[in-house]
Amino acid sequence: MREAMQLVPMVVEQSSRGERSFDIYSRLLRERIIFLNGEVNDAVSALVCAQLLFLEAESPKKPIQLYINSPGGVVTSGFAMYDTMRYIRAPVHTLCMGTARSMGSFLLMAGEAGERTALPNASILVHQPSGGFQGQASDMLIHAEEIRRTKHRMTRLYAEHCGRTYEEFERAMDRDRFMTAEEALEWGLIDRIITEREIGAERDA
């Protein structure tokens, strides 16, 4: 992630006040576009949540575009972003470019109903949460119970957002389940597959 940030290009704009330069992500933020690129962790979650809150404060009804290319990561960090997406008034439109795995797919399906999209060659993965821990047997049992509760919560939310039954997603998440964009559409994780930027998205941005 650090190496990627070092390669971020700068955009130079001319105005009556002179010349200003922005990194490309800051420039896209002005168009209400947020990138979730890379692993989901506390630092990335804090950044995305802050951008969501900032854009809502600027315009509480104007859509926000969340572009996702993520292998997933920390469950609690993902839940923080999920809850913030639901908390703000501005609708969040999600788009998968590349891959949305684990918590990446969870955030993809959490977008505004009817506005969850993927590019044609996107790859989506759903699976149950996992965790590794050491310690006394009693502590391990406590952690195992917490993972069980987290799995139940995630399965319920997947089912609610995707219009499927709890049992269907429980079976789907029992093992790693990779999906093409077409399969994700069939499962209700996304609402449509797009091949080029839509006119409405350009107008909203």
From Swiss-Prot:
Compartment(s): Cytoplasm
GO CC annotations on file: cytoplasm; endopeptidase Clp complex
GO function terms (MF aspect): ATP-dependent peptidase activity; ATPase binding; serine-type endopeptidase activity
PROSITE patterns found in the cross-reference section: CLP_PROTEASE_HIS (PS00382)
Active site positions: 102, 127
Catalytic activity: Hydrolysis of proteins to small peptides in the presence of ATP and magnesium. alpha-casein is the usual test substrate. In the absence of ATP, only oligopeptides shorter than five residues are hydrolyzed (such as succinyl-Leu-Tyr-|-NHMec, and Leu-Tyr-Leu-|-Tyr-Trp, in which cleavage of the -Tyr-|-Leu- and -Tyr-|-Trp bonds also occurs)
Record EC number: 3.4.21.92
Leading EC class: hydrolase
Entry keyword set: Cytoplasm, Hydrolase, Protease, Serine protease
A Pfam family annotated for this UniProt entry: CLP_protease
Matching CDD domains: S14_ClpP_2
One biological process term in Gene Ontology: protein quality control for misfolded or incompletely synthesized proteins
Coiled coil: none
Family: Belongs to the peptidase S14 family.
Subunit structure: Fourteen ClpP subunits assemble into 2 heptameric rings which stack back to back to give a disk-like structure with a central cavity, resembling the structure of eukaryotic proteasomes.
Function: Cleaves peptides in various proteins in a process that requires ATP hydrolysis. Has a chymotrypsin-like activity. Plays a major role in the degradation of misfolded proteins.
Full protein name: ATP-dependent Clp protease proteolytic subunit 1
